[in-house]
């Protein structure tokens, strides 16, 4: 068991007489103190942490081995203490080196002086064969990682301080540099004044035999009270409980301790370090200042051991690296104007460097005449309301004006002064009463049919033409020329070029340069054109990427050539003859249709009746139109047809193939007969062949009819069933008639008597509308199956009245009570007595096996009752 005591240095103790040699200052570890025998002597003095211990040779050797094992002695020290003697060459070399004045430091010189004085005292007191070993108490310095620049010098001084017979010991690794006894209880450093050291040597006390007996019973390490020293710069917590001590260590009671206080000369800052600290930047710690790695909940038990990894300086952080060390250089004002001219700042005006330093007069100049501030528009548009008194005063001021008296704003002027006295101004009306026969609405849109309005407009038109020159739009003026030499429908002069395809209008819609660009040659890159032809689709053409590799014409078709038939499906259905086939004649039929459409439009716009149009075509007046007359009429209508197209048109209109176009054929193929109904007098002329009635003004302009009949009575039919208007019957070509033996393939299926009906044929696949399975009450979001309860396209285009009102199928089939059904019938206007309603309810409840009634059942019952009542009425009649 090792115990540690700290006792103050007694001043009245005498040196021990039993010692064979003078005790020298030194320290010992607990393990070393326990190895000492009863012959150990400890001497304390005021030198820092000094102890004198007397050891036997055996104990001395044991202590040497313990020192080597514990690692408390440096290799150089071990060589000097154990293996090296005075006659050893290395020892002599080291002594010569240390004796040179260049290597010696002030502290080493002081130590050398002390050692000389101690040697003098040793020779005086040396009188026995007891081996004495001196233990030095020099401590290691604070920085454990050899990071401080003054470490080499300190180790030299430490070595010199212990280069007397004895050795330099260090505290165990992990031991802190500050102990609870070190705060406030330190003295002067060992490297102090040599005179003070001499005084301390003369006052060396000696411990008596009582102390030896105590040491023999239980080894103890007695630590003498050191002088006051400067505190180390950094504290390292050892994790042990610290004992609080007063500021002055004068208590005679011994205290326990595990830490040896280092001397102040080891902790004192060197002048080089002070200069380096002064050169560091403010707010940044120097790189050589090492802090403990662990400063949180864990303790660094071995602060002297180097830590793993790279220890970065604490002061250098990202903010320090990103902060500019030196301020930016400022551009001189003389050069700034040139820089601003070439690279103006964002949002700044580019100013020429020649006038950059000119006085700024333009911003303060104001051009024009300064106008006076008038009333703002806000006050004029929305003035502040005035009081009633102010309004009265304003009206009184304006009442003197004549305009205010005769035409006041918003009301009529006072007419009382100009009226006779006693006149009832409220009930008296001046002027003649207006008879309101017809309203403006009836004048603009009279409540009459179109036919009646048209007849009223035509009545008296011939008289208005003579009296007022009132002609209809597009009506030709009748100049009463001699019809024998002049016909009013003939055309004279040079014909104006006209095209119905709108090419002239297309020219007016484009600028001249656009038309010239269209006529100009379009230059396209051959590479682009080849790429488009090979890879891009074209309208109406099949994409053929390898067309350029084929040495064939563009319209070439590979494979066996199949000659198409002359007839098509339509020719087979209508059973046309070989000369009447329509296949391959689409262009020809299109041209004929275009000519017919143009003639129909001319006849409708220029003639009021079909008879007048037919008379225009019938130049000879024989009641038929031949080929020459048709060509003349086409020329008058600006249709210059070639011989082939004219023959096709004439052949199309001549249904009976007699070489002439009669009135019925003309009305069917060259006019819109449905838009020009047959008039009564026109019917008499066509059927009876009589002359026109001169008393009727509508028939006065009609030329004398031919005695031959133009139509048969059966050719005139009603325009619509039940209508009074009449029109001509529609002609059908023999080729348009469908054969009576024509039957479809679907009609021939199952035509055999006794065959299996088509409903019994097996069906394959899943039906589109799944009416075979019931629809779920709650459908999933992902369920897109049609169960037949949803509406189709017809229901969307033509919704029922129920859908328009928001009533759906589930509302019809929902079970309802008797009171609810009664309210629904009353709301829709169906009034039933109580007996009738009970009868309807009973019939509807019988339709369901559980007696439930819905709106659909009530509706079906009402329909059945109504149908039964109608059948009874028919039977009674």
UniProtKB/Swiss-Prot annotation:
GO molecular function annotation: calcium ion binding; calcium ion sensor activity
Reported tissue expression: Expressed in trachea multiciliated cells.
PROSITE patterns attached to this UniProt entry: EF_HAND_1, EF_HAND_2
Binding site for Ca(2+) 2: 654, 656, 658, 665
Coiled coil: none
InterPro entries assigned to the protein according to its UniProt record, in alphabetical order: EF-hand-dom_pair, EF_Hand_1_Ca_BS, EF_hand_dom, EFHC1/EFHC2/EFHB
One biological process term in Gene Ontology: calcium ion transport
SMART domains on file: EFh
Main localization, broad class: cytoplasm
Keyword Transport carried by entry: yes
Top-rank taxon, per record: Eukaryota
Keywords: Calcium, Calcium transport, Cell projection, Cilium, Cytoplasm, Cytoskeleton, Flagellum, Ion transport, Metal-binding, Repeat, Transport
Domain EF-hand: 605-640, 641-676
Matching Pfam families: EF-hand_7, EF-hand_EFHB_C
Location of region: Disordered: 1-47, 268-290
GO cellular component, as recorded: axonemal A tubule inner sheath; axonemal microtubule; sperm flagellum
Residues reported to bind Ca(2+) 1: 618, 622, 629
Transmembrane listed as a keyword: no
Oligomer status and interactors: Microtubule inner protein component of sperm flagellar doublet microtubules. Interacts with STIM1 and ORAI1; the interactions take place upon Ca(2+)-store depletion and dissociate through a Ca(2+)-dependent mechanism. Interaction with STIM1 inhibits STIM1 interaction with SARAF.
Record's function text: Microtubule inner protein (MIP) part of the dynein-decorated doublet microtubules (DMTs) in cilia axoneme, which is required for motile cilia beating. Cytosolic sensor for calcium, modulates the interaction of STIM1 and ORAI1 upon store depletion and the activation of store-operated Ca(2+) entry (SOCE) and NFAT translocation from cytosol to nucleus.
Protein name (database record): EF-hand domain-containing family member B
């Amino acid at each position: 068991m090792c115990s540690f005591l700290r006792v103050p240095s007694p001043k009245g103790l005498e040196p021990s007489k039993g010692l064979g040699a003078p005790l020298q200052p030194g320290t010992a570890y607990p393990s070393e103190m326990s190895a000492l025998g009863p012959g150990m002597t400890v001497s304390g003095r005021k030198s820092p942490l000094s102890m004198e211990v007397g050891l036997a040779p055996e104990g001395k050797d044991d202590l040497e081995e313990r020192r080597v094992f514990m690692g408390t002695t440096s290799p150089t020290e071990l060589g000097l203490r154990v293996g090296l003697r005075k006659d050893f060459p290395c020892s002599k070399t080291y002594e010569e080196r240390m004796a040179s004045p260049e290597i010696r430091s002030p502290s080493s010189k002081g130590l050398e002086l002390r050692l000389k004085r101690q040697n003098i005292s040793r020779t005086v007191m040396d009188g026995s064969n007891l081996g004495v070993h001196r233990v030095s108490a020099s401590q290691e310095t604070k920085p454990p990682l050899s990071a401080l620049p003054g470490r080499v010098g300190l180790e030299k001084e430490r070595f010199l301080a212990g280069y007397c017979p004895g050795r330099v010991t260090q505290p165990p690794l992990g031991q802190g540099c500050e102990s609870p006894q070190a705060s406030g209880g330190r003295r002067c450093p060992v490297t102090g004044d040599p005179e003070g050291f001499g005084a301390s040597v003369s006052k060396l006390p000696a411990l008596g035999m009582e102390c030896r007996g105590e040491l023999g019973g239980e080894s103890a390490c007695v630590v003498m009270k050191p002088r006051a020293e400067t505190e180390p710069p950094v504290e390292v917590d050892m994790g042990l409980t610290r004992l609080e001590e007063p500021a002055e260590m004068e208590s005679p009671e011994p205290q326990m301790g595990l830490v040896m206080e280092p001397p102040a000369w080891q902790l004192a800052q060197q002048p080089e370090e002070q200069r380096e600290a002064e050169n560091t930047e403010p707010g940044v710690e120097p790189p050589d200042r090492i802090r403990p790695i662990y400063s949180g909940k864990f303790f660094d038990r071995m602060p002297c051991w180097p830590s793993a990894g790279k220890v970065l300086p604490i002061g250098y952080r990202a903010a320090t690296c990103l902060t500019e060390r030196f301020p930016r250089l400022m551009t001189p004002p003389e050069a700034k104007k040139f820089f601003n001219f070439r690279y103006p700042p964002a949002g700044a005006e580019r100013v020429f460097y020649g006038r950059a330093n000119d006085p700024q007069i333009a911003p303060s100049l104001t051009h024009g005449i300064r106008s006076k501030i008038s009333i703002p528009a806000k006050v004029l548009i929305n003035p502040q309301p005035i009081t009633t008194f102010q309004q009265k005063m304003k009206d009184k001021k304006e009442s003197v004006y004549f305009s205010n008296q005769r035409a006041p704003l918003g009301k009529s002027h006072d007419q009382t002064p100009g009226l006779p006295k006693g006149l009832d101004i409220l009930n008296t009306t001046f002027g003649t009463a207006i008879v309101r026969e017809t309203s403006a609405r009836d004048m603009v849109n009279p409540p009459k049919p179109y036919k009646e309005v048209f007849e009223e407009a035509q009545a008296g038109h011939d008289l208005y033409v003579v009296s007022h020159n009132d002609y209809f739009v597009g009506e030709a003026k009748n100049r009463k020329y001699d019809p024998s030499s002049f016909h009013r429908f003939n055309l004279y002069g040079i014909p104006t070029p006209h095209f119905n395809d709108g090419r002239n209008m297309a020219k007016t819609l484009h600028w001249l340069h656009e038309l010239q660009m269209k006529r100009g040659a379009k230059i396209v890159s051959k590479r682009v054109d080849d790429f488009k032809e090979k890879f891009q689709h074209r309208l109406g053409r099949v994409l053929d990427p390898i067309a350029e590799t084929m040495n064939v014409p563009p319209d070439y078709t590979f494979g066996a050539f199949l000659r198409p038939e002359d007839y098509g499906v339509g020719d087979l259905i209508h059973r046309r003859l070989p000369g009447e086939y329509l296949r391959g004649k689409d262009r020809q039929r299109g041209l004929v249709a275009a000519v017919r459409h143009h003639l129909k439009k001319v006849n409708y716009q220029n003639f009021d009746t079909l008879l007048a149009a037919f008379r225009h075509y019938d130049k000879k007046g024989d009641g038929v139109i031949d080929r020459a007359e048709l060509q003349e009429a086409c020329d008058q209508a600006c249709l210059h047809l070639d011989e082939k197209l004219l023959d096709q048109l004439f052949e199309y209109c001549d249904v009976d193939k007699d070489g002439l176009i009669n009135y019925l054929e003309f009305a069917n193929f060259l006019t819109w007969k449905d838009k020009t109904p047959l008039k009564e007098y026109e019917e008499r002329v066509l059927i009876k062949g009589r002359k026109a009635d001169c008393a009727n003004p509508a028939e006065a302009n009609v030329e004398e009819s031919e005695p031959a009949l133009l139509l048969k009575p059966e050719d005139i039919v009603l325009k619509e069933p039940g209508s009074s208007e009449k029109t001509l019957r529609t002609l059908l070509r023999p080729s348009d008639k469908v054969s009576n033996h024509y039957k479809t393939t679907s009609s021939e299926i199952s035509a055999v008597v006794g065959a299996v009906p088509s409903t019994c044929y097996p069906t394959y696949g899943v039906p589109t509308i799944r009416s075979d399975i019931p629809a779920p009450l709650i459908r999933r979001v992902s369920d897109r199956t049609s169960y037949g309860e949803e509406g189709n396209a017809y229901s969307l285009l033509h919704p029922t009245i129920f859908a328009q009102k928001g009533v759906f199928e589930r509302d019809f089939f929902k079970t309802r009570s008797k009171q609810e059904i009664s309210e629904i019938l009353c709301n829709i206007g169906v009034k039933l007595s109580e007996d009738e309603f009970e009868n309807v309810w009973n019939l509807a409840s019988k339709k369901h096996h559980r007696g439930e009634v819905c709106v659909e059942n009530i509706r079906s019952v009402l329909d059945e009752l109504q149908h039964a009542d109608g059948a009874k009425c028919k039977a009674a009649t």
